[in-house]
């Protein structure tokens, strides 16, 4: 079968365009918002520094006045100095507390925005990767992405470690609930039957499997039995792609 290089190249171009759009319309607005927050915090810190400077100026002024009345008002001078020291300490402590609070809020905000951004980027990349992979697989072999993932998962089951196989058998014998198969996408009846047959052959389990869908698998399938599981997903590949995308964006800045 001939490879449609035009389709493959077109999909790669679409992916590069997506990366550029993410940088242009997602990363830049976030960075701009972070920069504005940093400017606001810097302004508030400058205000705190001005307050501290004003307190020190007031202390100097009080000391200068106290020296003029030192002979006649020794006790008054002492009280005024003590008041100035306490006021300075209070202002400094307040400024430090405000600085620490602002720094903590900034760190929490940056962490939250970074996590949110990573989640959105990962979701977009995942969707595009699946779209491209599905089209490429169909062009190359005429098979669906879901079938390919199911085949890889079945192969993973066949290659299970003997100790894991024994643990899974024991888990099923001690659990009345049927084993669960979770996947990102709905499995057709033929794919369910194929997985059922492999599980029966590998684990010698003559029981009906339960099938559910879940978004947390990120393009994969998992078989779980009473705390034991065997799974395969494209999470690791997406992590590598995400790292490569981040490096690409950093190099473009």
Curated annotation (Swiss-Prot):
Its main location: membrane. InterPro entries: Alt_ATP_synth_F0_bsu (IPR017707), ATP_synth_b/b'su_bac/chlpt (IPR002146), ATP_synthase_B_chain (IPR050059). One of its GO terms (cellular component) is proton-transporting ATP synthase complex. The chain crosses the membrane at residues 2-22. Disulfide bonds: none annotated. Pfam families: ATP-synt_B. GO terms for molecular function: proton-transporting ATP synthase activity, rotational mechanism; proton-transporting ATPase activity, rotational mechanism. Signal peptide: none annotated. It is a single-pass membrane protein. The keyword Cell inner membrane applies. Coiled coil: none annotated. The keyword Transmembrane applies. PANTHER family: ATP SYNTHASE SUBUNIT B', CHLOROPLASTIC. F-type ATPases have 2 components, F(1) - the catalytic core - and F(0) - the membrane proton channel. F(1) has five subunits: alpha(3), beta(3), gamma(1), delta(1), epsilon(1). F(0) has four main subunits: a(1), b(2) and c(10-14). The alpha and beta chains form an alternating ring which encloses part of the gamma chain. F(1) is attached to F(0) by a central stalk formed by the gamma and epsilon chains, while a peripheral stalk is formed by the delta and b chains. NCBIfam families: alt_F1F0_F0_B. F(1)F(0) ATP synthase produces ATP from ADP in the presence of a proton or sodium gradient. F-type ATPases consist of two structural domains, F(1) containing the extramembraneous catalytic core and F(0) containing the membrane proton channel, linked together by a central stalk and a peripheral stalk. During catalysis, ATP synthesis in the catalytic domain of F(1) is coupled via a rotary mechanism of the central stalk subunits to proton translocation. Component of the F(0) channel, it forms part of the peripheral stalk, linking F(1) to F(0). This is ATP synthase subunit b 1. It comes from Prosthecochloris aestuarii (strain DSM 271 / SK 413).
């Amino acid at each position: 079968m001939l490879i449609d290089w035009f389709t493959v190249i077109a999909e790669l171009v679409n992916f590069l365009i997506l990366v550029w759009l993410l940088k242009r319309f997602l990363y830049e607005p976030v960075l701009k918002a972070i920069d504005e927050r940093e400017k606001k915090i810097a302004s508030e810190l400058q205000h705190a520094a001005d307050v501290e400077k004003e307190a020190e100026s007031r202390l100097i002024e009080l000391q200068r006045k106290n020296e003029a009345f030192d002979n006649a008002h020794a006790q008054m001078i002492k009280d005024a100095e003590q008041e100035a020291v306490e006021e300075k300490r209070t202002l400094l402590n307040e400024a430090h507390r405000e600085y620490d609070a602002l720094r903590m809020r900034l760190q929490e905000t940056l962490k939250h925005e970074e996590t949110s951004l990573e989640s959105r980027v990962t979701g977009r990349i995942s969707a595009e990767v699946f779209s491209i992979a599905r089209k490429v697989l169909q062009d190359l072999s005429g098979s669906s992405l879901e079938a390919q993932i199911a085949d890889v998962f079945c192969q993973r089951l066949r290659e299970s470690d003997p100790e894991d196989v024994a643990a899974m058998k024991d888990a099923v014998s001690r659990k009345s609930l049927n084993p669960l198969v979770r996947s990102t996408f709905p499995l057709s009846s033929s794919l369910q039957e194929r997985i059922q047959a492999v599980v029966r052959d590998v684990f010698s389990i003559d029981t009906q499997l339960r099938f559910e869908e879940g978004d947390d698998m990120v393009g994969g399938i998992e078989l779980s039995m009473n705390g034991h599981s065997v799974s395969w997903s494209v999470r690791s590949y997406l992590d590598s792609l995400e790292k490569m995308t981040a490096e690409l964006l950093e190099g473009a800045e």
